[in-house]
């Protein structure tokens, strides 16, 4: 009996030693895991509120993760205090990301609804580093936009783009993705608003369509109507970057909804929770939708497939991209 007891004790000690070793490996990781999410909104817009609601839904789906969600808006700046690693800050919009970037550098921050140039500028200005500072970039991958163009205009060979100060940095990527799909990219630079329509007309003389790349120098509420009307006179389509641009007269656009961005943010929050200082690099929207303007298509004599059919074909060939 004594021998049996000694053997049993020895076996138990071995098991306990293994357990302690395993716990020793995992405790440092989970000790720093954040327990909550603080969402900072630039404003209480419908898009931001929809994002918040969907994020809560997505987080609730994971029964193994119980993250409390706190929501504040920029006017409540005195409330923008978080317990460093114990909370993930999700900033909605450029102004919100700017405010969140001023928190302690150890605080994990994830941006959304933020263009890539704005993210890079904020990160450099506030000396933040990748790892605990990231974002779901607002811009859609050029590969995805070219895919939409080829599905809508399969015979297209030349696509024009207007380049401003911000969008000029993308030209090499646009050309690369265009070449992959047999599209020759034509570009004209716009340095001031007076050059906008003349440069657009140059493109419309040769291009089969225009791809709009977000740039404050070129695309705004004030310039939308003259751009769309000019392209219509030339009987050439505009491929926009938002639902509102399609409603205004663009032929098509690929975009991500607030719910889709919230789903992606929730996935990042859950995956990175054990290691808050290990956020993924900035990434393009993973989930997306498309919108077509059938009235514009009829006016331009462009036959279109069903919206769902085009989306299905795009999804089959689409792959999410990191920056």
Residue positions per predicted region:
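Short hydrophobic alpha-helices and adjacent helix-cap/hinge residues
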Residues: 31-323
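N-terminal signal peptide c-region/cleavage motif recognized by signal peptidases
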Residues: 26-28
């Amino acid at each position: 009996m004594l021998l049996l007891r000694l053997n049993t004790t020895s076996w138990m000690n071995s098991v306990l030693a293994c357990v302690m070793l395993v716990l020793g490996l995992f405790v440092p990781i989970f000790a720093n895991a954040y327990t909550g999410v603080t969402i900072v909104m630039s404003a209480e817009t419908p898009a931001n509120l929809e994002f918040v609601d969907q994020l809560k839904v997505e987080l609730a789906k994971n029964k193994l993760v119980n993250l409390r969600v706190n929501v504040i808006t920029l006017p409540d700046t005195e409330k923008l205090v978080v317990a460093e690693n114990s909370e993930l800050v999700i900033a909605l919009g450029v102004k919100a990301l700017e405010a969140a970037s001023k928190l302690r550098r150890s605080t994990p921050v994830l941006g959304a609804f933020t263009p890539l140039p704005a993210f890079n500028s904020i990160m450099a200005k506030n000396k933040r580093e990748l790892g605990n500072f990231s974002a779901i970039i607002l811009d859609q991958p050029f590969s995805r936009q070219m895919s939409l163009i080829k599905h809508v205009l399969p015979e297209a060979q030349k696509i024009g783009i207007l380049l401003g100060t911000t969008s000029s940095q993308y030209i090499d990527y646009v050309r690369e993705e265009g070449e992959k799909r047999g599209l020759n990219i034509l570009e004209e630079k716009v340095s001031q608003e007076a050059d906008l329509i003349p440069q657009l007309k140059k493109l419309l003389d040769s291009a089969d369509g225009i791809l709009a790349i977000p740039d404050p120098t070129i695309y705004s509420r004030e310039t939308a109507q003259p751009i769309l009307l000019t392209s219509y006179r030339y009987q050439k389509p505009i491929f926009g970057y938002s639902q509102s641009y399609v409603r205004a007269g663009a032929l098509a656009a690929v975009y991500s909804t607030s719910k889709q961005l919230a789903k992606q943010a929730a996935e990042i929050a859950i995956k990175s929770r054990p290691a808050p200082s290990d956020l993924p690099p900035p990434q393009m929207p993973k989930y997306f939708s498309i919108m077509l303007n059938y009235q514009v298509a009829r006016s331009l004599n462009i036959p279109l497939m069903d919206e769902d059919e085009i989306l299905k074909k795009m999804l089959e060939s689409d792959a999410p991209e990191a920056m």
